[in-house]
């Protein structure tokens, strides 16, 4: 049994990490000003007092520490980080804690932040190795530094407690050594080799093809056209292929060893020298090194093979739950029924027939395991159902494999050994894979069933009527109010409800009927997808777990391979395979070299990978129109793409480069800037489009667009790729045509494959992964990798989420070879990576380029949508990729109020359309009774309080909870500077940044004038 030791610091500090891309509406449970003040104080204090002894001689006020035992907790009240003595209290608590540690062992120390009000925890994403004699001052500085770093990178809100969690390892490593926290870097710096670098070889070889500078000629073989020179340092053996145009040179030591080989080729008026050993090209002009090119070692995306037989081993599984109130309007979910369907019969389980929820779920899973090698689909499994069964799966079965993305388990493969039915018989081990169907077919089951014309429709059930006391209820039909969903409105009409009237309505019977409809509808949906995918592409959907992975597999199977003639192939005009069946099955070769990047190259290109544009230019405006770009990302994928083997170069001419460039940027005084940048605004990292001067990585074509609008670009280095116009054109055109010319499931499938391909190309395959590990395996992982989250599921079984890449600090502490581990990790990843960051970054860049000329005169933009005063020219309107469509049936928007990104109101002359991302809409498309008066108040700087239902989930506790949380809705737009006139916000101006990515000046114009303001504010009723 693993023993855990706890001590708790009671404090205010950041807890939850929220993504801030897109500048979502600011929903704050509490003001984060206190947090930012604490962080600023600590950073300023450390900067101003670099030699300050953190451990003050002042006697701490609270030093009492009880004996620490298994699962014992001790609370220590701290107010904030603003008082240095409170840091000393924490140091003393840690010191006394460390003194109680076993001297013969090393411990893994984790940090957990807790918010008491919302009863939520989050781990600081780094564990530390500590011993009996670890300096508590150093470790606490490391903890504070890490939390400060996270607070700068993410949006954080205050917490109440900070837990220190220790876990004993089974061995001892050397005394841990701590280093300053390494900040993430996006600027990858390189320079042209200078001096006596082994790469330049300047001391060995002259930078010319003129042989008179090569030294004393010692031999001339005219027959072989070879000349040998001695320059006093080395012997130069020159094979002249074409005099003065192409030479092949061996560099030989004086003891007759071959040192290097290089080729010299005349290059215009200069020289191109290729060092064969290092695979590097040096360019000289007038005896001066002007450029170095280095082809990169990269793999490529390989074609995938088609399946020979269809995998029809599919089950559909679901769990039914009800809510148990826990006070203050909150509740927790309890599973009371479950079941699965195999295409012929359904097996259902009801909690009244079992002694507990656990036994009911266990019985269902064991019965599913009788279907060996089946894939069990469960809709929204990764977000909901997994929480009820994860501990059962780990404790009762063997977990063979987990596929995860971020915090979610997408699928889990388990096995179980069934005892022989007859004496002397052989035991059988069966496996099943439980997967989330929602990741393959996003959307609600009800809507999907309608869109795909599934025979069995999702049922209607009074969810709110169920409670722990009426599970065997038989009586009158539940009141009509139970058939009204506050989010979706009426499930059935009042007439339909009246027609259902009965005094023998049975909770058990109706639950089972509803459950069976759900699992049958899901089974039919997945089988239809399986049949269509196999008959069309000869691909089994069970090979992949997400829609984007399926789209990429279709591309790699059908569109990427070269066409090779085969015998006895029959074409069918109704089958897409007829277009591509003539492919060699045994050895497929790709039409295009789609590079798989890793290491420094991947980091540089990923630094140039920016998301969509979401900005407010004019906050309040009358009489406008809304337009959406049809299939923006698929259209962008038909633009020229960077493929082939990338070459690192120091070429300064932007027009000669197609690829990714690190450049120094100087912007003009432009109101709608071209280039994006990640910058901390008010302590939070955001994607903005600033003016100013900075250095960063960008796609070359976006830099060329910037030059057209007055930007000054100084190229520092770049990765040049081959330019191809057609890697994805065939794929996009094919599915766009199906989407535009078909209906039903074919249309939905084509739309899915069209829109999800791009996302897979940019996935980060080097991120964290989730595994179930033994204690020894966990100990070994903690020696080399950052453990983000871990908890014990069962004896010697741990749920562990950790970084795939080894951590240099942990490797140094545990005396592991970081370089070797990194190399092995890179080699392992190369075979697994099936993405191409260069394609993703170029696609995102092309999408911004395509939209730029249309947003110049817009009031608001969000990735592929614009709001403009004048309708677009008819040449831009139409069906299909590359055209715009008028939103809201082309209606004139009488008034629009834009408060923040994805927070706005549109008034169509009394009829309102409200966008408020993160807050659920009511059935009438309003948001918690927000109206135009509320938006005008927000526009004027006031706030509005909302109460929102939030679902929380905990794998560790195996629970799903429902809470009503209070949110303070404010006008927190800060991606551009607000401009005022007569005290009213009427316009925005880009932020200005410097080389350190700091906002140094906020507005181009301080006041836009009274006449302009009146023109915009006047409401034309």
Swiss-Prot record:
Belongs to the DNA polymerase type-B family. This DNA polymerase requires a protein as a primer. Pfam families: DNA_pol_B_2. Signal peptide: none annotated. It comes from Neurospora crassa. SUPFAM superfamilies: DNA/RNA polymerases (SSF56672), Ribonuclease H-like (SSF53098). Gene3D superfamilies: Helix hairpin bin, Palm domain of DNA polymerase, Ribonuclease H-like superfamily/Ribonuclease H. It catalyses: DNA(n) + a 2'-deoxyribonucleoside 5'-triphosphate = DNA(n+1) + diphosphate. Coiled coil: none annotated. It is an enzyme of class 2 (transferase). One of its GO terms (biological process) is DNA replication. The keyword Cell membrane does not apply. It is found in: Mitochondrion. GO terms for cellular component: mitochondrion. Keywords: DNA replication, DNA-binding, DNA-directed DNA polymerase, Mitochondrion, Nucleotidyltransferase, Plasmid, Transferase. Its EC number is 2.7.7.7. Its main location: mitochondrion. This is Probable DNA polymerase. The keyword Nucleotidyltransferase applies. GO terms for molecular function: DNA binding; DNA-directed DNA polymerase activity; nucleotide binding.
């Amino acid at each position: 049994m693993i023993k855990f030791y706890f001590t708790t610091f009671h404090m205010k500090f950041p807890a939850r990490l929220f993504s801030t891309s897109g500048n979502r509406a600011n929903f704050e449970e509490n003001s984060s000003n206190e947090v930012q003040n604490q962080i600023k104080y600590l950073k300023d204090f450390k900067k101003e007092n670099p030699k300050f002894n953190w451990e003050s001689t002042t006697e701490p006020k609270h030093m009492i520490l009880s004996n620490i035992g298994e699962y014992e907790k001790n609370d220590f009240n701290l107010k904030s980080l603003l008082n240095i003595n409170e840091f000393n209290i924490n140091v003393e608590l840690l010191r006394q804690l460390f003194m109680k540690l076993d001297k013969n062992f090393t411990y893994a120390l984790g940090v957990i932040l807790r918010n008491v009000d919302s009863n939520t925890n989050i781990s600081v994403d780094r564990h530390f190795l500590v011993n009996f004699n670890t300096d508590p001052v150093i470790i606490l500085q490391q903890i504070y530094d890490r939390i400060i770093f996270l607070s700068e990178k993410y949006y954080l809100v205050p917490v109440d407690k900070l837990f220190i969690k220790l876990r004993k390892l089974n061995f001892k490593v050397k005394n841990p050594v701590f280093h300053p926290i390494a900040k993430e870097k996006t600027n990858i710096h390189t320079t042209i080799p200078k001096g006596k670098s082994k790469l330049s070889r300047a001391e060995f070889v002259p930078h010319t093809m003129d042989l008179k500078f090569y030294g004393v000629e010692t031999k001339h073989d005219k027959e072989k056209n070879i000349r040998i020179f001695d320059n006093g340092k080395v012997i130069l053996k020159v094979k002249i292929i074409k005099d003065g145009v192409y030479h092949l040179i061996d560099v030989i030591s004086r003891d007759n060893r071959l040192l290097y080989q290089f080729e010299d080729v005349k290059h215009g008026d200069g020289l191109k020298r290729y060092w064969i050993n290092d695979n590097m090209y040096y360019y000289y002009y007038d005896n001066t090194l002007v450029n170095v090119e280095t082809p990169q070692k990269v793999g490529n995306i390989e074609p995938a093979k088609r399946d020979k037989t269809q995998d029809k081993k599919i089950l559909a599984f679901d769990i039914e739950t009800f809510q148990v109130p826990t006070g203050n309007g909150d509740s927790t979910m309890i599973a009371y029924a479950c079941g699965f369907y195999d295409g012929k019969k359904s097996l259902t389980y009801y909690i009244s027939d079992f002694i507990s929820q656990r036994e009911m779920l266990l019985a269902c899973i064991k019965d599913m395991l009788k279907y060996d090698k089946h894939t069990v689909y469960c809709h929204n499994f990764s977000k909901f159902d997994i929480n009820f069964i994860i501990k059962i799966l780990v404790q009762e079965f063997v977990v063979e494999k987990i596929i995860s993305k971020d915090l979610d388990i997408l699928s889990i493969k388990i096995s179980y050994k069934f005892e022989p039915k007859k004496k002397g018989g052989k035991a059988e081990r069966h496996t099943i894979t439980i997967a989330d169907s929602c990741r393959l077919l996003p959307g609600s089951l009800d809507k999907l069933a309608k869109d795909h014309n599934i025979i069995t429709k999702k049922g209607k059930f009074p969810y709110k009527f169920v409670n722990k006391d009426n599970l065997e209820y038989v009586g009158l039909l539940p009141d009509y109010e139970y058939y009204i969903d506050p989010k979706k409105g009426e499930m059935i009409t009042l007439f339909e409800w009246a027609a259902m009237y009965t005094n023998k309505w049975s909770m058990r019977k109706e639950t089972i009927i509803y459950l069976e409809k759900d699992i049958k509808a899901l089974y039919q949906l997945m089988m239809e997808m399986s049949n269509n995918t196999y008959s069309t592409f000869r691909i089994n959907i069970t090979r992949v777990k997400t829609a984007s992975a399926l789209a990429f597999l279709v591309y790699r199977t059908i569109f990427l391979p070269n066409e090779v003639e085969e015998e006895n192939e029959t074409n069918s005009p109704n089958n897409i395979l007829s277009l591509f069946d003539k492919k060699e099955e045994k050895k497929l070769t790709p039409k295009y070299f789609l590079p798989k990047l890793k290491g420094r190259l991947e980091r540089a290109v990923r630094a140039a990978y920016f998301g969509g544009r979401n900005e407010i230019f004019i906050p309040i405006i009358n009489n406008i129109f809304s337009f959406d770009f049809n299939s923006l990302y698929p259209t962008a994928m038909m633009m020229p793409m960077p493929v082939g083997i990338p070459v690192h170069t120091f070429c300064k001419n932007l027009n000669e480069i197609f690829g990714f460039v690190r450049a120094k940027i100087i912007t003009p005084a432009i109101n709608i800037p071209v280039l994006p940048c990640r910058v901390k605004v008010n302590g939070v990292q955001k994607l903005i489009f600033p003016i100013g001067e900075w250095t960063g990585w960008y796609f070359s074509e976006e830099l060329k667009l910037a030059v057209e609008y007055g930007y000054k670009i100084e190229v520092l280095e770049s990765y040049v790729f081959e330019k191809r116009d057609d890697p994805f054109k065939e794929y996009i055109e094919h599915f766009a045509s199906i989407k535009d010319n078909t209906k039903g499931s074919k249309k939905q499938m084509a739309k899915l494959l069209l829109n999800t391909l791009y996302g897979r190309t940019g996935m980060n395959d080097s991120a964290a992964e989730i595994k179930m590990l033994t204690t020894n395996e966990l100990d070994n992982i903690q020696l080399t990798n950052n453990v983000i989250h871990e908890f014990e599921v069962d004896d010697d079984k741990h749920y562990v989420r950790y970084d795939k890449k080894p951590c240099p600090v942990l490797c140094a502490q545990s005396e592991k070879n970081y370089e070797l581990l990194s190399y092995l990790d890179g080699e392992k990843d190369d075979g697994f990576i099936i993405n191409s960051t260069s394609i993703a970054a170029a696609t995102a860049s092309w999408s911004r380029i395509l939209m730029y000329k249309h947003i110049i005169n817009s009031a608001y933009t969000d990735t592929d949508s614009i709001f403009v005063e004048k309708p677009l020219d008819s040449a831009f309107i139409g069906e299909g990729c590359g055209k715009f469509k008028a939103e809201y049936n082309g209606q004139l928007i009488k008034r629009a109020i834009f408060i923040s990104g994805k927070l706005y109101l549109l008034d169509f002359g009394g009829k309102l359309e409200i966008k408020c991302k993160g807050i659920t809409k009511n059935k009438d498309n309003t948001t918690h009774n927000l109206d135009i008066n509320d938006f005008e108040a927000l526009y004027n700087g006031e706030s509005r309080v909302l109460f929102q239902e939030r679902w929380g989930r905990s794998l560790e506790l195996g629970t799903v909870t429902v809470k009503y949380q209070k949110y303070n809705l404010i006008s927190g737009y800060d991606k551009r500077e607000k401009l005022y006139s007569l005290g009213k916000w009427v316009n925005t101006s880009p932020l200005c940044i410097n080389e350190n990515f700091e906002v140094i000046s906020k507005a181009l114009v301080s006041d836009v004038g009274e006449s302009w303001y009146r023109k915009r504010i006047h409401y034309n009723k």
